[in-house]
């Protein structure tokens, strides 16, 4: 376990510990018929995706980063009977699997080895899985009506994008209520890891927002929109998947503990290509960002600051500067260095779609990005950034790059 305290204090400081999730059973269950509802654009070649993801983990480890993988964390978590009970009490309910199958599904999961439990919690349980375990009348009826390939509870292939389900902001974490139903069960699993796993249980950290036992309604939050950039400031995108209802509550919690003095809200349009702030804007160095200008230059910035005289204890102001200028000013910088998506208009649009601006910073001036974004990678290198590349051919089919596929847990501050 890392000796440094849990917490993320910048976007570009030295990364010490990060959580990722390798492709697995959930991805083996993607088909042309179900991938759209599971938020993937296509099926993937899973064995190749696993090799590419292992290469991603290896390249981070070569930089001295502790990389923890979600299947492994979950396996170690469910070895604790109390942790397994906590998960199953919330995941296998009459509302989720039905009264007739509740006991059988629970019996099936409890009868597995911890590694297989982790695989099925992420990979889902099908009618065929249950039939192999116990060919009961309830299972027969389910399979006769819906078919053995139907899911009693569905796979969670988007766990590959660990950035979104929880996000560490300074000395605490949010347990994010996700926008799409296909992703909402992911947060339960990461919450269990933080509650029971030895790396986290007993450690001191705040829960800024979120509770898997609550229905948050319209107050949705996803980590791809959240960036603790340092100097007491947090950037939060407000677009397709993160709502103002959630942003206000996160800001209030941060202000109440003095963890932040300002939240800069980035008003985004709602689109699949720009589903999160980090798909059009990410840090590559202490003062350098890469952006997709077509979207980033149209962001409407607002600033939230603590003010007990205002409704909810928050002062909300629309900024009269551009988003990039507001970010620079919040970090006491005269200006940000900016690398735009590379190529002509067609090439830039393709590279943004392929996560050219969605890079993860390992330390100041060192990022990991996809190999296929050659124009943008070349511009970053010309700006002095070391770009470590990984294969995009399979990992990118869920629309997420290096930033999306990482949940930083310990990251150093940067002195601004």
From Swiss-Prot:
TM segment ranges: none
Any single GO CC term annotated in Swiss-Prot or TrEMBL for this entry: cytoplasm
Family annotation (InterPro entries): Arg_deiminase
Pathway per the UniProt entry: Amino-acid degradation; L-arginine degradation via ADI pathway; carbamoyl phosphate from L-arginine: step 1/2
Gene3D superfamilies (UniProt xref): Arginine deiminase, L-arginine/glycine Amidinotransferase, Chain A
GO MF assignments: arginine deiminase activity
Disulfide bridges in this chain: none
Swiss-Prot/TrEMBL keywords: Arginine metabolism, Cytoplasm, Hydrolase
GO biological-process terms attached to the record: arginine catabolic process to ornithine; arginine deiminase pathway
Compartments it resides in: Cytoplasm
Signal peptide limits: none
SUPFAM superfamilies: Pentein (SSF55909)
Catalytic residues as annotated in Swiss-Prot or TrEMBL: 404
Short name of any one Pfam family annotated for the protein: ADI
Reaction it catalyzes: L-arginine + H2O = L-citrulline + NH4(+)
Known EC number: 3.5.3.6
Major localization class: cytoplasm
Enzyme superclass (EC): hydrolase
HAMAP family, A to Z: Arg_deiminase
Family as reported in the entry's similarity comment: Belongs to the arginine deiminase family.
UniProt protein name: Arginine deiminase
The organism of origin for this protein: Ectopseudomonas mendocina (strain ymp) (Pseudomonas mendocina)
């Amino acid at each position: 376990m890392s000796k440094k305290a849990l917490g993320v204090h910048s976007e570009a400081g030295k990364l010490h510990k990060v959580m990722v999730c390798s492709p697995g059973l959930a991805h083996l269950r993607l088909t042309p018929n179900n991938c759209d509802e599971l938020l993937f654009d296509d099926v993937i070649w899973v064995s190749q995706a696993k090799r590419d993801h292992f290469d991603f983990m290896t390249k981070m480890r070569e930089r001295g980063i502790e990389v923890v993988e979600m299947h492994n964390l979950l396996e170690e978590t469910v070895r604790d009977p109390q942790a397994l009970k906590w998960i199953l009490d919330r995941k296998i309910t009459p509302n989720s699997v039905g009264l007739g199958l509740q006991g059988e599904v629970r019996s099936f999961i409890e009868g597995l080895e911890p590694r297989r439990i982790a695989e099925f919690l992420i990979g889902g349980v099908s009618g065929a899985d249950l039939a192999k375990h116990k060919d009961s009348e309830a299972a027969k009826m389910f399979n006769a009506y819906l078919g053995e390939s139907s899911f009693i509870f569905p796979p969670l292939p988007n766990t590959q994008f660990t950035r979104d389900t929880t996000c560490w902001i300074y000395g605490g974490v949010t347990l994010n209520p996700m926008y799409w139903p296909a992703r909402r069960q992911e947060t339960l699993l990461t919450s269990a890891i933080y509650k029971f796993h030895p790396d986290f249980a007993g450690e001191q950290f705040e829960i800024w927002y979120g509770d898997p036992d609550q229905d948050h309604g319209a107050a949705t939050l996803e980590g791809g929109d959240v960036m603790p950039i340092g100097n007491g400031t947090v950037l939060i995108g407000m677009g397709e998947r993160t709502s103002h209802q959630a942003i206000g509550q996160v800001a209030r919690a941060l202000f109440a503990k003095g963890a932040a003095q300002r939240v800069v809200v980035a008003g985004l349009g709602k689109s699949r290509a720009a589903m999160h702030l980090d798909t059009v804007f990410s840090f590559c160095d202490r003062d350098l960002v890469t952006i997709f200008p077509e979207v980033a230059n149209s962001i409407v910035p607002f600033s939230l600051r603590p003010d007990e005289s205002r409704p909810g204890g928050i002062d909300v102001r629309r900024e009269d500067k551009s988003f990039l200028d507001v970010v620079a000013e919040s970090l006491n910088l005269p200006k940000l260095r900016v690398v735009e998506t590379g190529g002509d208009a067609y090439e830039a649009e393709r590279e943004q779609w392929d996560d050219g601006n969605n890079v993860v910073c390992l330390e100041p001036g060192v990022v990991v990005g996809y190999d296929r974004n050659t124009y943008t990678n070349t511009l970053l290198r010309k700006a002095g950034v070391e770009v470590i590349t990984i294969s995009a051919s399979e990992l990118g089919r869920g629309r997420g790059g290096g930033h999306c596929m990482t949940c930083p847990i310990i990251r150093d501050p940067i002195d601004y």
